[in-house]
A protein has these predicted regions:
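Small/polar glycine-rich anion-binding or flexible loop at a beta-alpha turn
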Residues: 289-296
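Hot-dog-fold acyl-thioester-processing enzymes
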Residues: 1-90, 154-288
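HotDog/MaoC-like acyl-thioester-processing domains
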Residues: 1-9, 88-90, 95-217, 299-347
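Generic detection of short hydrophobic beta-strand segments and adjacent strand-loop junctions
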Residues: 22, 142-144, 225-228, 291, ...
Length: 347
């Protein structure tokens, strides 16, 4: 249970810059594209990427979650304590420039807001990624619910510790003294974060295969189905660096109160993003992607889980040749995205 003397709202605004940069690797882009089943040629060959005007292999939309997870480790392991776990609820990607192989990302992390809903703490973390040119290329907002001992049994943590890979920390064990020291240091040495947003995605001529003139409000995207096996979940866990065993271990999933192993929320979002960019024909034409998770996708051991994606045009802006999409994702007939939207630019 959260320590009554420890007020997480006092940490709002806590921020730091990760000491080292994250370099987007050519083969890592391909690994991640395979993990989210994204076959767009720009993720796989330099020739296809160059034909769209990119300098290297283009990373899939949700690829940025990998450096974000690395960057947020300090926040959740050494700064925010008292929770037994976290449940992801919302994710927003602001895409100012597509990531390409060779990019060096400098990460700024901030605890943006803390809200209480139905007695639970909802924490929103902001990740700002600056490239080697000093421009902000991606901003990501992640909202999680802090889970206490009332939500997660104590034996769950012990069971997880027995099955996760050596050297992986799932929950924090920092003391309040360490928190105070870390908090003070971060405020005293706050980095000069980049303020210039890259205008690449807003000024570049999109190379979409669909044109603005061919669309109307209410237009429905061709539906897409995705198939997930336990092997897909294990692969995504390794590629993304998400060690949570509820995504691959039956016993831990059941002990955590789940009916079975479930797919990573970020994996389902990655599949959804690929659904959008495959239809567009240009990964860089997606400028904002927002998802609220409302349910989980179960993946049984004996059979694959099937996900269904559909979408429609919510609005069109003829002056900017942009559109807003509403995306629906279902698993076993249940909606797993409560609300999902995408801002796109069109040729």
């Amino acid at each position: 249970m959260v320590d009554a003397t420890y007020d997480v709202t006092a940490l709002v605004g806590h921020h730091y810059r990760v000491d080292d940069y994250y370099e987007v690797g050519r083969e890592k882009v391909r690994e991640y594209a395979r993990a989210v089943q994204d076959d767009h040629p720009a993720h796989w060959t330099e020739k296809a990427a160059a034909e769209l005007g990119y300098s290297g292999l283009v990373a899939p939309t949700t690829f940025v979650s990998i450096p974000a997870m690395i960057a947020n480790r300090r926040l959740f392991e050494s700064v925010i304590t008292g929770y037994n776990g976290y449940l992801q609820t919302d994710q927003v990607f602001e895409l100012y420039k597509p990531l390409v192989a060779g990019d060096r990302l400098f990460s700024d992390v901030e605890l943006e807001t803390v809200r209480q809903v139905a007695g639970k703490d909802l924490l929103t973390v902001k990740n700002t990624f600056t490239d080697q040119a000093g421009e902000v290329v991606h901003v990501m907002h992640t909202t999680v619910v802090g889970l206490t001992s009332e939500d997660v049994a104590e034996e769950v943590g012990d069971a997880m510790a027995r099955v996760v890979m050596h050297g992986v920390e799932l929950l924090s064990s920092a003391t309040n003294q360490e928190i105070a020291a870390s908090n003070g240091k971060a405020k005293d040495s706050a980095p000069e974060a980049a303020t210039a947003l890259s205008d690449f995605s807003r000024t570049r001529q999109p190379q979409t295969t669909v044109r603005f003139e061919d669309l109307a409000v209410g237009f429905e995207l061709p539906a897409r189905e995705a198939r997930l096996t336990r092997g897909d979940l294990v692969n995504y866990a390794g590629v993304s660096g998400d060690p949570n065993p509820i995504h691959w271990h039956d016993g831990i999933a059941v002990l955590s109160g789940l009916p079975d192993v479930i797919a990573h929320g970020m994996l389902t979002m990655g599949l959804g993003a690929g659904f959008i960019t495959d239809w567009l024909g240009d990964p860089g034409a997606l400028t904002r992607y927002s998802v609220r998770l409302s349910n989980y996708a179960i993946v049984e051991a004996k059979s694959a889980g099937n996900l269904e994606f559909s979408g429609r045009i919510k609005s069109l802006d003829p002056e900017t040749r942009t559109a807003v999409l509403v995306i629906t994702a279902k698993s076993a007939g249940r909606k797993i995205f409560g609300l999902a939207t995408a801002d796109i630019r069109l040729a």
